[in-house]
Amino acid sequence: MQWEVVIGLEIHTQLATQSKIFSGSATTFGSEPNTQASLVDLGMPGVLPVLNEEAVRMACMFGLAIDAEIGKRNVFARKNYFYPDLPKGYQISQMDLPIVGKGHLDIALEDGTIKRIGVTRAHLEEDAGKSLHEDFSGSTGIDLNRAGTPLLEIVSEPDMRSAKEAVAYVKAIHALVRYLGICDGNMAEGSLRCDCNVSIRPKGQTEFGTRCEIKNVNSFRFIERAINSEIQRQIDLIEDGGKVVQETRLYDPNKDETRSMRSKEEANDYRYFPDPDLLPVVIEDSFLETIRAGLPELPPQKVERFQTQYGLSAYDANVLASSREQADYFEEVVKIGGDAKLAANWVMVELGSLLNKLGVEIDQAPVSAAQLGGMLLRIRDNTISGKIAKTVFEAMAAGEGDADSIIESKGLKQVTDTGAIDKMLDEMLAANAEQVEQYRAADEAKRGKMFGFFVGQAMKASKGKANPGQVNQLLKAKLEG
């Protein structure tokens, strides 16, 4: 039987506010346990929550960016459940009247097509604390620093049909919230976490199958692996005569499998009711218009502009626009270096490789956009070749200065003097007389392969400094003359 996969995602986005959603406690990551927890966060009697307006503003920014309905009147509710790191015994969230209603987000698939994914809603809520199992022998510690940190939970429609589509959607959300400046997107620190709802059904069937939720997956790679693992588990289970049970599961990356955590709760299990300590939030049109006016250029618009303005391919434009910092870096390089396609290649390949090696983001790049742009100018005016440029780039990355000073101090200027190149080629060909005779006796197909040998010998003789274009032109004339 052929199966169709149905996937919906819930993405928990930690908002980049300086203080918590209902208290004045700081939200700094990595502080000593329980040093950023106020009486409100601890759920002490007699204290009242006060809503952080910045969290509301950030949620509205997201809603406007996905062309969603904004709840002009939204209500906070108590979600009741017991967990050791939830001191109040309930979580303040939103149920019936969320701040962001239906919207959509377009994602780019691997084949270059665009697919629209519906967003059901996005609601504000507070994060829970954190249980510390490793630091205690025979017991568990509780760190409430995270309790009360503002979250925007983004709930998609079940519109995705493969793990790759799900990853593309999460990447699009990740890029968007970073562009908006409402989340740092650091998945390793838990700033963006994903719950994956997965079900299967016979191809052609419209009724949904029984879904299972995979909780708290925190990397793009693990999202893809977790979903594929769960898909295969459900297929094997049904084809062996079993039945999928609705439940919450965890993904084990070491075993590459999901395992049962608990039965899946429904909304009525949480006994939602409006929080009596918080008034309904009324959002005025003037508030939204101020936010709308301040929205930055968003990833889809930037991708389109990069293609039309700079002549980049859809793939290159999507890669460069995947983060606001990278897009800004690229445009700064183009402003100085002039050639957009050359700049795109260096930013994506050479700089990308360097950043991966160092394990840092582009805002910590050891080579500034101004330095890289200056080096590209020297490639374009034939001061250095593309090969020598890699040596210059490595020196800039090592902190040895800008391109001009490195080229000067290391004597890396390209040899463009025709007489000097001509003499060097004569010496190289004399040293390879046997290969010259073989070349002249060969047919066109073999000559093409052999020509590369002579070019390599010429560049070796010049220590990479000879202008490749001139070498090719003069060498061809000498070999075929």
From Swiss-Prot:
The keyword Protein biosynthesis applies. The keyword Ion transport does not apply. It comes from the Bacteria. It is an enzyme of class 6 (ligase). Gene3D superfamilies: 1.10.10.410, GatB domain, N-terminal subdomain. One of its GO terms (biological process) is translation. PROSITE patterns: GATB. GO terms for molecular function: asparaginyl-tRNA synthase (glutamine-hydrolyzing) activity; ATP binding; glutaminyl-tRNA synthase (glutamine-hydrolyzing) activity. Its EC number is 6.3.5.-. InterPro entries: Asn/Gln-tRNA_amidoTrfase_suB/E (IPR017959), Asn/Gln-tRNA_Trfase_suB/E_cat (IPR006075), Asn/Gln_amidotransferase (IPR018027), Asn/Gln_tRNA_amidoTrase-B-like (IPR003789), GatB (IPR004413), GatB_C_1 (IPR042114), GatB_Yqey_C_2 (IPR023168), Gln-tRNA_amidoTrfase_suB_CS (IPR017958). SMART domains: GatB_Yqey. It catalyses: L-glutamyl-tRNA(Gln) + L-glutamine + ATP + H2O = L-glutaminyl-tRNA(Gln) + L-glutamate + ADP + phosphate + H(+); L-aspartyl-tRNA(Asn) + L-glutamine + ATP + H2O = L-asparaginyl-tRNA(Asn) + L-glutamate + ADP + phosphate + 2 H(+). Keywords: ATP-binding, Ligase, Nucleotide-binding, Protein biosynthesis. Allows the formation of correctly charged Asn-tRNA(Asn) or Gln-tRNA(Gln) through the transamidation of misacylated Asp-tRNA(Asn) or Glu-tRNA(Gln) in organisms which lack either or both of asparaginyl-tRNA or glutaminyl-tRNA synthetases. The reaction takes place in the presence of glutamine and ATP through an activated phospho-Asp-tRNA(Asn) or phospho-Glu-tRNA(Gln). Heterotrimer of A, B and C subunits. Belongs to the GatB/GatE family. GatB subfamily. This is Aspartyl/glutamyl-tRNA(Asn/Gln) amidotransferase subunit B. The gene is gatB.
